[in-house]
Amino acid sequence: AWVLSHRGHAVANGLPVLSCNRVGHEASPLASDKHVGASGIDFWGNSHVLGPQGEFIAQAGSDPTVLVCEVDLQRSEQVRRIWPFLRDRRIDAYGDLLRRYID
């Protein structure tokens, strides 16, 4: 779900998305308390860079990695012309819609 939501954000905004995640186990400060039973959390890594159409430009694995890649910022302009998601926004209607919840 983590990667899928990032891909959706890239497509909806027509922008690259860079996502970082740690790797390894981080012990809980409560791990020493036998009554709590919290051992900690496992981080799976898989940091990634997505292009403006949600495609993978670079992806790290589950080992500690320095991920370096080039991102073509001009491509966002091209993609936004092909997929003009934001073109059909009705910003002028936002005030009336929000007033229902504010009042």
Give the positions of each predicted feature.
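CN hydrolase (nitrilase-like) catalytic-core segments centered on the catalytic cysteine
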Residues: 1-67
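Cysteine/selenocysteine-centered motifs that mediate thiol-based redox chemistry or coordinate metal-sulfur cofactors
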Residues: 77-103
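A structural signal for well-ordered alpha-helical scaffolds and beta->alpha junctions
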Residues: 2-3, 72, 90, 98
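A short, polar/charged loop-to-alpha-helix boundary motif
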Residues: 64-82
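Short, surface-exposed linear patches
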Residues: 8-13, 40, 71-72, 80, ...
